């Protein structure tokens, strides 16, 4: 397995174009088991031998309502997390939006910014530019960032509703 965060440019094959769906299914699965990952980020998805993704690093996860001090890397962190006492499923969904953005664009959000600059950008709703994405992908990512999804099943429904051509639009990879 290799770490997806080391990827630069990907070929648009079936395995890679399905990564956003695979990432969402992984999050949906852990949420269905009462687990909140608390550190969803491209750095915690591994590429298996067959090209599919595996979610990793559950060290800071919340299980069945336990509290976690883990909050993920700054650019994956939901802006309202500071107001909450601990990470929730909503934090994982916000972070999923960043993961999808990074998979689809091949760009890491907020490169070169300090943690405090990232926090200020997120708190003021200055998210990465979605122009490189199709309208359907922009909508899904923006809904993650705007906390419009109640659960991962809703994200899956939107992903499953994408047209075949939108699912196969260019993707960046290793």
Language model region names:
Residues 27-48:
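Catalytic-loop of the protein kinase fold
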Residues 92:
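Conserved catalytic-loop aspartate of Hanks-type protein kinases
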Residues 106-174:
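Helical subdomain adjoining the active site within ATP-dependent kinase catalytic cores
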Residues 96-106:
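Short, conserved alpha-helix in the C-lobe of eukaryotic-like protein kinase catalytic domains
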Residues 2-11:
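AlphaC helix of the protein kinase catalytic domain
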């Amino acid at each position: 397995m290799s770490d997806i965060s080391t990827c630069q440019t990907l070929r648009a094959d079936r395995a890679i174009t399905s990564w956003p769906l695979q990432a969402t299914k992984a999050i949906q699965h852990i949420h269905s088991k009462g687990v909140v990952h608390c550190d969803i980020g491209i750095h915690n998805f591994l590429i298996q031998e067959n090209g599919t993704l595996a979610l990793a690093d559950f060290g800071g996860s919340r299980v069945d309502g336990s509290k976690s001090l883990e909050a993920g890397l700054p650019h994956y962190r939901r802006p309202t997390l500071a107001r909450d006492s601990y990470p929730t499923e909503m934090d994982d969904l916000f972070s999923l939006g960043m993961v999808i953005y990074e998979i689809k664009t091949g760009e890491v959000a907020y490169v070169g910014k300090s943690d405090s600059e990232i926090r200020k950008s997120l708190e003021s709703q200055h998210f990465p530019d979605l122009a490189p994405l199709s309208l359907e992908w922009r909508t899904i990512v923006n809904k993650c960032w705007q906390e419009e999804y109640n659960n991962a099943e809703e994200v899956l429904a939107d992903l499953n509703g994408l047209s075949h051509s939108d699912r196969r639009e260019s993707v960046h990879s290793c």
